[in-house]
């Protein structure tokens, strides 16, 4: 039954709707400006500036929502607007969105503002956008000066090499390329290596998204090759190979490699999108099966991703019958974790009380999760979705889980109309806990898991992250085989840690003591003491010492800390370095002039 009013008679309703949309438009303008600034910072190789920009953009959305709430409270006394007017506000807002190019994001912004003003009893489709109201299908920016979402190129006309060069140069990057002809040759060789010689069909074409995707020290060209009935995804990372010179680093042609680049364990891209839904639709065609929620999140629209995820959860609950259960594995001291077996995510709640030796607070743990959200995750830390007032049907909760919730988090629970409302929780992708992966794995799987674990921790330390609790149970294995850290309550910046060696025992009593004979400060770390916790299984020990014997040396950790303190930002690659053109085709690079060679300027080609 439709409860909406027949007439839109409220001027306040229209004014509030218009004010909310104006505030959203301001938010999205700032969002796009960040992507434009990212291109400038990338061209200057200002990596610290790019990091700062990415951090600031993450908090920008909440700032704009709060500004809008304050305006509505000050100018319209929003909390006291009656129900009929609130319904009209939504209808007016829908009317204002009919020609909008980011309607789905504007609807989410509307929800965010309303959730700050209205009681949760109003969280229905009468008052907020539980379901989308405006279609985003075939949405494009048709203004004459606007860039299309993607450009189509036809190699049959000019040849593949010339087409590839035009694709790169159309992005008009300011620094010249070290040797673009060489790089295009590498791209063509990689295509041949992957597919062999293939016959060009009449519809042979290449589609390329019109904006670059910026993250870390790379700018990615993302597109698809169409040939007959085949759709082949690709991404080309562009990197600074030496001061003032660019190069195409590799060509990623496999769908699984693109899915890793757009993974939940990586930081969000900075990408300028006039019509974000069109970008997401394009990305869905090259990564079928990847949820739209994750794609929206990966391109920096994490609130839209969060909104879509919640809709996916509600949809799944209405089309499934299994129960939420306590997550398998070792129970944590700080978090209560549960899952729905038919849904590939885990739900994490901060407990009301923590047993010794944990010395922390709810506020400190929430700040750790925010630290991870703001930090460069490098594909090694799981992203989290943070929710308030999540209502789950009591009938879908296992009895053991309900007892555990009532025991561990009573302050966060409310019973309401057959639902259990959880006041605060985090949601993450479900992974195989690394301790179980190693415990049950074959020799090959153990070697892979241990090698990945060491690589993950080493990459995190280079990114200024000390995990705190190094146990395998705090790491997970993704469906792509990547080892990812997901327990953040003890996380610290490595630069805040004091890396120490264990001093030699003073006497035999010290040597036999089960307690440290030396003082340990709150930020002291002793890498050589990690062995007993990580190397108990002989099979694990053998491969750990084969690949990561230096893991337990304080000098490794101190060297990373020293470089960070000197302002160095190391290179990270979300793909195996063996795929880099310089590694894959070394003969093509042997003749490249050195940066100091007088011929280098002649070989440099400007992408303009």
Curated annotation (Swiss-Prot):
GO biological process, one term: glucose metabolic process
Example of a GO cellular component annotation carried by this entry: cytoplasm
Active site, UniProt feature: 383
EC number, UniProt record: 2.7.11.5, 3.1.3.-
Localization annotation: Cytoplasm
Chain positions recorded as ATP binding sites: 327-333, 348
Swiss-Prot/TrEMBL catalytic activity: L-seryl-[isocitrate dehydrogenase] + ATP = O-phospho-L-seryl-[isocitrate dehydrogenase] + ADP + H(+)
Manganese listed as a keyword: no
This protein's UniProt keywords: ATP-binding, Cytoplasm, Glyoxylate bypass, Hydrolase, Kinase, Nucleotide-binding, Protein phosphatase, Serine/threonine-protein kinase, Transferase, Tricarboxylic acid cycle
One Pfam family it belongs to: AceK_regulatory
A GO term for molecular function: phosphoprotein phosphatase activity
UniProt xrefs under HAMAP family: AceK (MF_00747)
Family membership noted in the UniProt record: Belongs to the AceK family.
General function of this protein: Bifunctional enzyme which can phosphorylate or dephosphorylate isocitrate dehydrogenase (IDH) on a specific serine residue. This is a regulatory mechanism which enables bacteria to bypass the Krebs cycle via the glyoxylate shunt in response to the source of carbon. When bacteria are grown on glucose, IDH is fully active and unphosphorylated, but when grown on acetate or ethanol, the activity of IDH declines drastically concomitant with its phosphorylation.
Protein name: Isocitrate dehydrogenase kinase/phosphatase
Species in which this protein is naturally found: Burkholderia ambifaria (strain ATCC BAA-244 / DSM 16087 / CCUG 44356 / LMG 19182 / AMMD) (Burkholderia cepacia (strain AMMD))
